[in-house]
């Protein structure tokens, strides 16, 4: 899974508490840090965009079927893999799924759905790329991630807190 930054974990539930887990973690971290952008790009291969689904919204409310597409299924992801794709980009809008300051907590049900879709992708041995998509469009109701608005300190705080939650959720 790729977010804004590349990361990987060994999947151990011991949180690195034993020597083997620490060795596994070091090996995985070493493998990722030794890859340059060209190598990563080659490894990820041809990608497919799962657009107009998790970034679809109406009146500032994200909903994967609001633009007329069906619910994302694992069968869809399997069909994508069968066509030879190795990577799936999953654009996601958060908009009103983000709570108020100071925590800006993302709605757990929405994050669970994003997780489910990411799990379809990763579970089929594909790379997943997720982003924040549409939250900065001037044409999208309730967009908040706009670089020319006067409240830049608030926007930066919200951006950092939202990405921290996404990164924490998908770190493994």
Q: Where on the chain are the PLM-derived regions?
A:
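C-terminal motif of bacterial Sec signal peptides marking the signal peptidase cleavage site
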Residues: 4-7
């Amino acid at each position: 899974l790729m977010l804004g930054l590349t990361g990987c974990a060994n999947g151990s539930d011991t949180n690195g508490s034993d020597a083997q887990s620490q060795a596994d973690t070091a090996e995985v971290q070493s493998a990722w840090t030794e890859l340059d952008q060209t190598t990563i790009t080659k490894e990820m291969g041809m990608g497919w965009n799962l657009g107009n689904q998790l970034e679809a919204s109406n009146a500032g409310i994200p909903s994967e079927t609001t633009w007329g597409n069906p619910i994302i299924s694992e069968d869809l992801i399997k069909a994508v893999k069968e066509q030879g794709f190795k990577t799936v980009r999953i654009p996601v809008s958060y908009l009103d799924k983000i709570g108020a300051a100071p925590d800006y907590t993302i709605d757990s049900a929405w994050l669970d759905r994003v997780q489910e879709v990411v799990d379809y992708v990763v579970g089929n041995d594909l790379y997943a790329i997720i982003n924040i998509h549409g939250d900065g469009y001037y044409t999208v109701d309730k967009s908040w991630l706009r670089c020319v608005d006067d409240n830049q300190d608030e926007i930066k705080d919200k951006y950092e807190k939202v990405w921290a939650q996404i990164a924490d959720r998908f770190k493994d």
